[in-house]
Amino acid sequence: MIVRWDLNSYAALLAELGIRRPLLVTTPRWTRLGLEDHRLFDGVRPHVPADTVEAATAAARGCDGLVAVGGGSAIDTAKAVSVRTGLPVVCVPTTYSGAEWTPSFGVRDEQRRVKGGGGGARIAGIVYEPELTLSLPRAESGGTALNALAHCAEALYVEGRNDEADREALAGAGAIARALPRVLADGRDLEWRRALLEGAMHAGAALAGAGLGLGHAMAQALGGRFGLPHGALNAVCLPPALRFNEPVAAAALERLAQAMETDDAATRAADLARLAGFERLRELGVPEDELDAVAEAVVLRPGTRANPRRASVADVRELLGSVW
């Protein structure tokens, strides 16, 4: 995979990869980036509904590559199409989601209100351009950055952790903890936007190298059921997941706290979430009477199985209730 900084390097990257007839996979917001010569699919929707993947796959006929411009939903849509078509993907992320680093993706079944997963996408390149994040709304900046922080935290203690992922996770957590308050205070500060994007890059690499844990499993189950923003859900779910894992992952959480320049990682994560405007699931629109069903869905997810501490349905229900 080739990584470049600066959108000016984009054309050369496509040429290097031999992509001449790309499909631009995005939302209407990003259709005016000077890529008008690309075939366009601008029907990306949150949580990647299955019918969106079908439509994007049809649009890709005759193309020799996919260019995803946007956040996790745009990138996951392109990855789902890549698996169906074999086409390579170039990602131009405009949020801090980290989706550009992994071959896996989620697709939502809207009728059943569940989100499933897949893998095997061909990620060929990434282009980071901090200026594309300047217009990102405050809530989306905070939510996607806290999603990236969750990638860092979980990479340190999940079943698939390793030394290289640890290094990426600690670098990412430190950068995010320093930069996020600055970005939330002034979203037009390009220097801190770049620092936050660098933190998200490290977080994505940590995610790719290690995998996800319980906090993400909770957010995924909630997102699939209610169609709520993935970043906001991770912001709320990460602190209780860290607390739950403290008895078995104390050393990892101490390293996380040191990277974040704090004495307590869970408290700092909750403070950052509160600063970004995320504190309670009910404030996001999650109904209390569905928490039992959500807990049952959480324990079936891969992140729960990879978590260092076994979590029962009752455990998860208690965690969800603590932040409802």
Regions found by a protein language model. Give the residues of each.
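Glycine-rich phosphate/pyrophosphate-binding beta-alpha loops
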Residues: 98, 201-234, 301-305
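A glycine/threonine-rich phosphate-anchoring loop and its flanking beta-alpha core
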Residues: 80-164, 171-172, 248, 252-255
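Short, amphipathic C-terminal "tail helix"
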Residues: 289-324
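Short glycine/serine/threonine-rich phosphate/pyrophosphate-binding segments
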Residues: 8-10, 30-33, 50, 73-80, ...
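Gly/Pro-rich interdomain helix-loop hinge
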Residues: 225-290
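Glycine-rich phosphate/diphosphate-binding loops and the adjacent beta-loop-alpha structural elements
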Residues: 155-209, 220-223
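A short, small-residue-rich loop immediately preceding and capping a beta-strand
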Residues: 60-96, 218
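ATP/NTP phosphate-donor binding region
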Residues: 1-65, 281
